[in-house]
Amino acid sequence: MQWTKPAFTDLRIGFEVTMYFEAR
């Protein structure tokens, strides 16, 4: 997966942040 779409990147970052807070 080498997508360079801003939307996809923003979604991935948002998902990682959500998982980070959920892990806490």
UniProtKB/Swiss-Prot annotation:
Short name of any one Pfam family annotated for the protein: PqqA
Gene Ontology BP term (one): pyrroloquinoline quinone biosynthetic process
Record pathway: Cofactor biosynthesis; pyrroloquinoline quinone biosynthesis
Similarity comment: Belongs to the PqqA family.
Function according to Swiss-Prot or TrEMBL: Required for coenzyme pyrroloquinoline quinone (PQQ) biosynthesis. PQQ is probably formed by cross-linking a specific glutamate to a specific tyrosine residue and excising these residues from the peptide.
Coiled coil residues, start to end: none
Protein name, per record: Coenzyme PQQ synthesis protein A
HAMAP family attached to this UniProt entry: PQQ_syn_PqqA (MF_00656)
Organism in which the protein naturally occurs: Acinetobacter calcoaceticus
